[in-house]
């Protein structure tokens, strides 16, 4: 198992344990986000990336049934309103495609298998048993 994700949340801890080089990290870092948001315009990203535009339009062009309106709300949350694409999903899209392509290229190779083994050997910190034990010690003082 490897992680394909942005370098935030639990992925930071996973990379600390297993090494960033053993995972597939894409997108803006937490340190970059503030500067990006000062000039960020999602509509420019959409217009510059036809593949992204096609994917985004499937949310509202009838490709998928949307009786609840959830897909339209998702589309609007990334393209309009007070703070469109708040989580920089559109901004990170091109880098996601690049890194995912690399992952698919690497898949099954000896190097990829090594990354998986390193990750598997490093996940003890994230086990439910450890979490429950730590919680019991912290909360119940056992």
Label every PLM stretch briefly.
Residues 1-116, 121-125, 130, 134-142:
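Catalytic binding pocket for nucleotide-activated donors in carbohydrate/polymer assembly enzymes
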